[in-house]
């Protein structure tokens, strides 16, 4: 049994997996623990290790289990005295994790983020904790956060949960119903993030476009962005996870005229075959998706559109898949990611007939990615010679690197910069594009921006 020790003598490390929304949870947990007196470290030679897990699809679950098993080595042979699994995998399989991984000292569900200090203290006394209740956590106040990733970019989680009932998805089970955070709290949190050095605020949720629809004082994503754009120090505001049916004329008009709102929309479309979209439980069909993309491009000059697509959904035929490939070639999205359908227990799709064989899913995944790679390469090559504004993030060898308005952190490419003088990370420069691949650009710095 573990013996208790003083909080101020304890070092805590976090391994965070999955999406940026999960990353925010990890930053909040570390912030609460730091405020309580624990020392935060990036090294796994720590007294306490939290593994913040993902359980969206099978690959994510496997990665999370492997991460727990890897850190369990420190539980047996290193300094670690407490090992906890947090996040979506802990929410979904708490008893299985405790049964199958004896090195675990506890599991902490998605609804217990705000109680992490008490849970860690109990685990430090030797109690094997199982804290998994309804996924009801919501940041109703500005909570402390320990930043991860680039110091110049911060994620702002504007809501929790999801009310969309896509038939393949377990997120509503793991995160609960859709719950918007109060706009006043979000503005205060964004102000604090900017004061800490964030030049870019990235808004995330399971569905950002639904924001405010559940609040007593009805508000909207457009209203929230307008308030955030007035904050001092915020240069870019970026929107991810925009549900196609939730994109309003007001939001489009704001993006067209507000210079701080990146001309960038991440719109998960999932497929282009009406037959597959209906089977998925999606509400917007292919004709309307095409119409939306054409409208957005005409209304917002210079807009970058990113999307995500699933291949191998139950019943997807070769004709359905060819329709998706045709959509990619015709609509020429700037960015697109692809993943293979994962048969998740407890979802309606898992019980559907005509499950697509794994080898077919893999082959379709490769074909779709190859088509999009050539689309992206051609679009990037067409930008050679044009000018772009870049947020400088760091240096690699002789080159600096950063991102343009068209590049979201972690998921899109980079702009590699050649400069006649030293550049300061966290600043913006104007550059001319000199070369392009399917993902990254090369550019020559023309001037530094204020």
From Swiss-Prot:
Residues 381-447 form the TRAM domain. Its cofactor is [4Fe-4S] cluster. Binds 2 [4Fe-4S] clusters. One cluster is coordinated with 3 cysteines and an exchangeable S-adenosyl-L-methionine. This is Ribosomal protein uS12 methylthiotransferase RimO. GO terms for biological process: tRNA modification. Residues 148-378 form the Radical SAM core domain. Its EC number is 2.8.4.4. Pfam families: Radical_SAM, TRAM_2, UPF0004. One of its GO terms (molecular function) is 4 iron, 4 sulfur cluster binding. It comes from Desulforudis audaxviator (strain MP104C).
């Amino acid at each position: 049994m573990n013996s208790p020790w003083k909080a101020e003598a304890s070092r805590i490390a976090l391994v965070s997996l999955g999406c940026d929304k999960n990353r925010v949870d990890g930053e909040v947990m570390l912030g609460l623990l730091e405020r309580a007196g624990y020392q935060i470290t990036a090294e796994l030679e720590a007294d306490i290790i939290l593994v913040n897990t993902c359980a969206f699809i099978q690959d994510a679950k496997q990665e999370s289990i492997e991460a727990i098993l890897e850190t369990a080595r420190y539980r047996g042979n290193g300094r670690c005295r407490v090992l906890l699994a947090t996040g979506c995998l802990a929410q979904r399989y708490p008893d299985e994790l405790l049964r199958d991984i004896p090195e675990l000292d506890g599991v902490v569900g998605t609804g217990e983020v705000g109680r992490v200090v008490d849970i860690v203290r109990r685990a430090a006394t030797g109690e094997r904790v199982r804290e998994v209740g309804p996924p009801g956590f919501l940041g109703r106040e500005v909570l402390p956060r320990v930043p991860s990733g680039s110091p110049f970019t911060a994620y702002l989680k504007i809501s929790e949960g999801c009310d969309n009932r896509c038939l393949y998805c377990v997120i509503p089970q793991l995160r609960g119903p859709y719950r918007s955070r109060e706009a006043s709290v979000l503005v205060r949190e964004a102000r604090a993030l900017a004061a800490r050095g964030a030049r870019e605020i990235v808004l995330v949720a399971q569905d950002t476009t639904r924001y405010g629809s559940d609040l007593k004082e009805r508000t909207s994503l457009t209203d929230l962005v307008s308030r955030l754009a007035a904050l001092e120090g915020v240069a870019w505001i970026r929107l991810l996870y925009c549900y196609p049916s939730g994109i309003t004329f007001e939001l489009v008009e704001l993006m067209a005229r507000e210079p701080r709102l990146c001309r960038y929309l991440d719109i998960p479309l999932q497929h282009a075959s009406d037959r597959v979209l209906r089977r998925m439980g999606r509400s917007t069909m292919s004709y309307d998706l095409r119409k939306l993309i054409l409208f957005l491009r005409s209304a917002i000059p210079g807009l970058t559109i990113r999307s995500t697509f699933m291949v191998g959904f139950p019943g997807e035929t070769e004709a359905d898949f060819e329709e998706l490939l045709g959509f990619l070639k015709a609509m020429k999205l700037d960015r697109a990611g692809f993943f293979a359908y994962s048969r998740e227990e407890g979802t309606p799709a898992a019980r559907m007939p005509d499950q697509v064989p794994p080898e077919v899913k893999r082959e379709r995944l490769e074909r779709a990615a190859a088509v999009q790679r050539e689309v992206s390469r051609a679009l990037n090559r067409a930008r050679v010679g044009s000018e772009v504004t870049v947020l400088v993030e760091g240096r690699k060898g002789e080159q600096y690197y950063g991102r343009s308005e068209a590049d979201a952190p972690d998921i899109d490419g980079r702009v590699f910069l050649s400069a006649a003088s030293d550049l300061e990370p966290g600043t913006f420069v104007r550059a001319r594009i000199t070369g392009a691949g399917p993902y990254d650009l090369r550019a020559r710095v023309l001037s530094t921006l204020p």
